[in-house]
Amino acid sequence: AIEEGVVDLEKDTFYDSGSVIVSGARIGCWKAGGHGHQTFLQVLESSCNPGVVKLGNLLGKERLFSYLDLFGFGSKTGIDLNGESKGIIFPLDRVGELELATTAFGQGVSVTPIQQVTAVSAVVNGGSLYKPYIVKSFLEPETNSVIKSYDKTFVRNTISKETSDKMKYALESVV
């Protein structure tokens, strides 16, 4: 939403009454009665599901799902491990209001831990997504010389450096 310019984390606001109704389903906030009036930075800091649903709606399903794809969700990362799963993402033609809402706050998808780490790494790496790997190099045990090594493999840009900087600030403000 930041990259697309649909929200300013510190200026735009949301009122959390404690829940939101989406396609007849109640999506609640963890805090009974809600958080009240918040900036979207505070929505992220307080992990407010209704606020994140609003962000998903502002972004729209096409843009949200294009970012899921851009960050590698729903695809194998190519990591050097057998048995990697691609995770489960709704097909875009089956995404209604409820699927958009739950996907926005992370409960409408199934991702692997390595996909999550790869995506977060891209967010804090200036937007650059790299292929993950488990082993950087193999060393000969007696001489400690490198037998084989792997270089960083750039895959694609996901977000701008400016958005990355804003996201780093937001992530740091949570802890």
PLM segments and residue spans:
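Beta-lactam-recognizing serine transpeptidase/beta-lactamase-like catalytic domain environment
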Residues: 2-175
